[in-house]
Amino acid sequence: ISGLVYFLPPFHRNIGKRLTKSAKVFFADHGLVCYLLGIKDLAGWNNHIYKGNLWENLVFMELVKTAHLRPGANLFFYRDQNGVEIDFIVESGNTLYFLEAKAGERIDEKKLSFKKVIPLFEKRYQTKAILLQNLSEPHVLKKKGYHCINPLFADVNL
């Protein structure tokens, strides 16, 4: 449309369902979104009710930059009928990268959907789980079954 808004389609093997299911909306200009929400500084961002949504939007824009550099990579999200969601899925060949965006440094493992969703796809695809987290650590951290990356410090190379 104008380049300010992106629509992220849901992941589904059936192309028709990708087109008919509701997409997620993201904004290209993170600064404009913060301005419209009245966020004037980092403290305002850290304490904002939409901090998680803002982080997900920021992560989305980092992934869009990465995806444009990798022909054939397709970016989606996943949500089932019970509301279980994976923020982003990158399809690259026979591999699905499951990406969760979390704004906090300390994450309750129960809030991650990797264990619920990845088994649904393991027979058909190779799978990898990545937590895109607002960490102060600039390096990739390996955790139980997934990697943690702050996309502001390190490129998300898939």
Task: State what each model feature region is.
Residues I1-L96:
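Accessory nucleic acid-recognition modules appended to NTPase machines
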Residues Y35, D108-E109, P138-K142:
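Switch/connector loops and helix/strand junctions flanking conserved nucleotide-binding motifs
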Residues N74, K128, G145-H147:
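Conserved beta-strand segments of alpha/beta enzyme cores
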Residues G83-V84, K110-I118:
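A short, acidic, amphipathic alpha-helical segment used as a generic capping/interface helix at domain edges
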Residues A101-E109:
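Short beta-strand-loop-alpha-helix junction that forms the active-site gateway
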Residues T127-Q133:
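Short, hydrophobic beta-strand segments that form beta-sheet elements in well-ordered domains
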Residues L135-L158:
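Domain-level recognition of nuclease-like catalytic cores that cleave nucleotide substrates
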